[in-house]
Each structure stands twice: as C-alpha cells, then as structure tokens.
Amino acid sequence: YCIKKVAVLNCWGKMRAWGNHMVHHAIYYKQNYSYAGVIEALSGAPFDVKFISFDDIRKDPHILDDIDVILNIGDADTAYTGGDNWTDEKIVTAVKKFIYNGGGFIGVGEPTGHQYQGHFLQLATVMGVEKETGFTLNADKYNWEEHDHFIKEDCTKEIDFGEGKKSMFALDGAAILVQREKEVQMAVN
C-alpha cells in the first residue's frame, strides 16, 4: 500500500535508482552522508518511489502528472541536484507548473543550486530560501524566527541535519522551522 507517489529528480533518473549518494560500495564520505539517509528513509516508507531525470522531463513534461512530491537532494552544481539543467526554461516551467497545480517539492541540501540570473537556488522563490553567495549581502534579512509546524510535531530530539548547510537564509513569507546561528536548516513556504 502506497499513500503517495514520490519522484527523486536528478541527472541519472532510473540509471542510479536507489544508488543515489552512494559511492564505492557505500563507503562513508563526509560530502554525501547527509543525503544518503533520505534515500534510505524512502526505501522503508509507504511511498511509490520513482527516479526521474531532467531528460525525462524534457522528453515528456507530463511525466510529472501522476507524481505527488518531487525531491531534489544534494549539493549544488552536481548530478544529484542538476546543476545547469535548472537554466532550461522547459525544466523550470514544468516543475513550477507541477507545484502550482498542488504538487509538493522537497529540497535537501542545495536543491536547484546553480548561480544564474541573480539566484543561486533556481527555485528560491518557490522554496522560500536562498543561499548567500555574496550577491545579496546588501539585502536586509530579517526573517530568522523559528515557527512550530506539523512537520516537527513528532520530533522528540533536536533534528540532526548531518553536515547541514551554511549561508542559507529565508525569504520574506517563508516559515523557518530550524535555524542554527542564522543559517536556515529547515523551512517551509
């Protein structure tokens, strides 16, 4: 029984299904252990998990029609998150249309990360977070208050984000769920 259909979006799609964030027989690497747990959690969750690539979306944007949630997981400018695939208007339009029509989007790490047209995270305005790379140092950033949310209701301990991410900040309107030393670790928009 599966309650939702989840798509993991990366450059490989089905080619590396379930092998995401594993290198050389799943040896521990500081750079990817923070993400491996997401894929592991999906393997035991009641979701129908599909691995799709950016080329799959280019070929047929309707591939997203039967998906409930898209996950984009990893560091910026890697095959995990897509790098310059996020400069392709067809990709951005298809994913934003999916979200506009009620689909969920969960980003972990630096999702949609690629410096382009004034943004580092190409879906920053959708996710409600952006990474400070030096281009927005002059912009005021007042959204630092943490909020309660149903996502954290069952958490009895401090959430472990692994390595976490530095220099992430919330845009106006986003709700910060966890920030550490004014670096957003979890937010909803």
Language-model segments: which ranges?
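The substrate-binding groove and active-site-proximal loops of carbohydrate-active enzymes
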Residues: 21-31, 48, 72-88
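Short, solvent-exposed loop/turn segments at secondary-structure junctions
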Residues: 12-15, 56-57, 76-78, 111-114, ...
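Catalytic beta-strand/loop cores that center a nucleophilic Ser/Cys/Thr
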Residues: 18, 138-189
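Aromatic-Pro/Gly-enriched surface loop or interdomain linker
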Residues: 1-67
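Short, well-ordered alpha-helix to beta-strand connector turns
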Residues: 66-68, 173-174
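A glycine-rich, often tryptophan-bearing local segment used as a flexible ligand/cofactor-contacting loop or short
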Residues: 77, 82-160
